[in-house]
Amino acid sequence: EEGFKLIMIRPDKVKMAKEMIVKAQSKLLIGTVISFPEGINSLDEKLAEALKAIEDGADELDYVCNYQAFKRGEIELVKEEVLKGTKLAFEHHKVAKWIIEVAALTDAQIIQISALIKNVVIPNFKEDFYFNVFVKSSTGFYQTENNLPNGATVPAVIMMLENASPLPVKAAGGVRTYEEAEEMIRLGAPRPFNRRGDRRNLLRQAGRRELVPAWG
């Protein structure tokens, strides 16, 4: 487990992973992605995919928000999917994360969509559930131009924190060194995510100190 809280896997692998974790008597959690990586599936498709993942043993659901619809001004569509996707997680005692794909958004849009998610969650769910609804920065798969970052950046995370609070923020993509992970945690994003190719390097840099980034 290497000190990691959670593994992130595709929905079709959740059942197999759950069986392996149970067999190993591990406490490792399973997270999976919904409507990955573009977030353009219909609401019904997203909910069906999420429910199947829950039934297969997923603990955390990382929905890709329909940020393209948001950019087109289809605000009610985005509000509805955030409400119903979060409600499904709430009813099954699961964590919901909403990936907003910061590399595809302007600063103003990052601010607006972070606030939108907060403003859907706060009036519709109990306060003790707020900390189970994350605003997450990135899929790590968005194609940028001119080699611009496609994951979490310090400015983007700050904007998310300032506008999503009290919902927690997850920094994903671009967190490749111990120092970067430490900076994200210091800012207030407690669970920086790094993909498989970087996690051993992070552990080596951390020297297995107390501060170890969560994978997921």
Which role does the model predict for each range below?
Residues 1-16, 61-79, 101, 135-149:
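Glycine-rich, proline-tolerant flexible connector loops at the mouths of alpha/beta enzymes
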Residues 4-60:
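Active-site cofactor/substrate anionic-group-binding motifs, chiefly glycine-
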Residues 11, 15-35, 75-97, 104, ...:
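Alpha-helix-loop-beta-strand connector modules within alpha/beta enzyme cores
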Residues 19-20, 42-43, 73-74, 107-111, ...:
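Short, well-ordered secondary-structure micro-motifs
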Residues 32-34, 55-70, 121-147, 173-213:
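Glycine-rich phosphate-binding active-site loops on the catalytic face of alpha/beta enzymes
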Residues 38-55, 105-116, 156-166, 175-191:
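Catalytic cores of alpha/beta
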Residues 40-44, 48, 72-76, 130, ...:
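Residues at secondary-structure transition points
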Residues 100-101, 107, 111-114, 132-140:
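Active-site pocket-lining segment
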